[in-house]
Amino acid sequence: MIKNQYINSDESVFNDAKALFNLNKNILLKGPTGSGKTKLAETLSAAVNTPMHQVNCSVDLDAESLLGFKTIKTNEQGQQEIVFIDGPVIKAMREGHILYIDEINMAKPETLPILNGVLDYRRQLTNPFTGEVIKAAPGFNVIAAINEGYVGTLPMNEALKNRFVVIQVDYIDGDILKDVIKQQSQLQDDAIIEQIIKFNEDLRTMSKQGQISEEAASIRALIDLSDLITVMPIERAIKRTIIDKLEDEREQQAIKNAIELNF
């Protein structure tokens, strides 16, 4: 068993992702923040025994962040020379590894067309910094993740989206969520786990209604909360892992109200 693997009662999510990987299809994981998209990519990487190189997208992402950069290095003869340091895209291509592009719709649209040749049948790239044409080694594949409707995201270009096959990754719940908490956190007390799962369900409802951000109701936040509960009171653990991350006082108060109802 893969340690801290992605778990979902809908086995088709992982099985389809693995099938798409074996078909050398680009995979786009779409779902709310903290639903386990990165964990799914990591589990797939381990299952197919292929290392993964990650790009974390933001509005500041540029070609150097993707491809690499030039720098000055002293060679064995003591002379300085200009060398190119491969970035995550080129590393993954050369080694036949997985390229994971997280929050791809956080990047500026004008940054991503440089990957068009990487994402289509050519699987190749002309490095604009060196002129080298890089052809991906066998085994290379691309997985991207998208948080639709999240603050700071941009609509994904249709031409780019059409280069992927989409898998929806929703939040998990019930017994599966209980198993994930036990597997990925220090908390093992069933009664407390059921309490915080109910609390998390309330947060998800509030998130869907626009009262709080998605991140506050994420699986990631729940795992952090589960760990902290083993060393401090529940209310303080919630404050540290969820409330103190929020800037909006109305969101903070909404969660405090949920605490009073659940604990």
From Swiss-Prot:
SMART domains named in the record: AAA
The keyword ATP-binding belongs to this UniProt entry's keyword annotation: yes
Fetch the InterPro entries from UniProt. Answer: AAA+_ATPase, ATPase_dyneun-rel_AAA, CbbQ/NirQ/NorQ/GpvN, CbbQ_C, ClpA/B, P-loop_NTPase
* A GO MF term: ATP binding
Keywords attached to this entry: ATP-binding, Nucleotide-binding
Q: Is Nucleotide-binding there in the keyword field?
A: yes
Q: Name one Pfam family in it.
A: CbbQ_C
Binding positions (ATP) = 31-38
Family named by the database record: Belongs to the CbbQ/NirQ/NorQ/GpvN family.
What protein is this chain from?
Uncharacterized protein SH1500
